[in-house]
Amino acid sequence: PLGTVQKIFSGETVNPRYDTLLALEHFFEEPLEVREHVYNRYERNGSYTVDDYRTLPDEQRGELIDGYFYDMASSTFGHQSIGGEIHRQIANFIVENGGNCRPFIAPVDVQLDCDEKTMVQPDVGIVCDSSKIQRFGVYGAPDFLVEVISPSTKKKDYTLKLSKYIEAGVREYWIVDYMQEKVLVYFFE
């Protein structure tokens, strides 16, 4: 159940049952219909930089995480609709309440760690520090991020991006699984 998973990831449950751990392990290791992959064919994988990322062809959508390229397939209609609606609701809320934060929707480049090894494209985000908004996109951790998962990005969104967002200083992260009709919300200090 989702409540159990949230308690485990939040640290509330320190010693989960063995069968729960096995179920989680199976979930994260199950074979997926992978349309996204790491660029294994490149010998330099792990040492790529933002400069390499910027040389990708315009039609090639991808992310650079810790020096590794991840190919990103184009979004489905459902995926894009959910992300668009979340963005619309957030933008309306900010305007109606006179807020100064700036919402954005993919594809926007986010140089998450302010280093040369990571550039991600979250589905939706909010930046409250206007100095982070640069000509190319966002430099530094946004305050709020949303990833709408698909079968090909599930593992990366639940694990790799979760840890990257925590380390970078993102304050709130939503994982939206519209196929399961679930939203997992993380609040970070």
Regions found by a protein language model. Give the residues of each.
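Short alpha-helical DNA-recognition segment
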Residues: 1-7
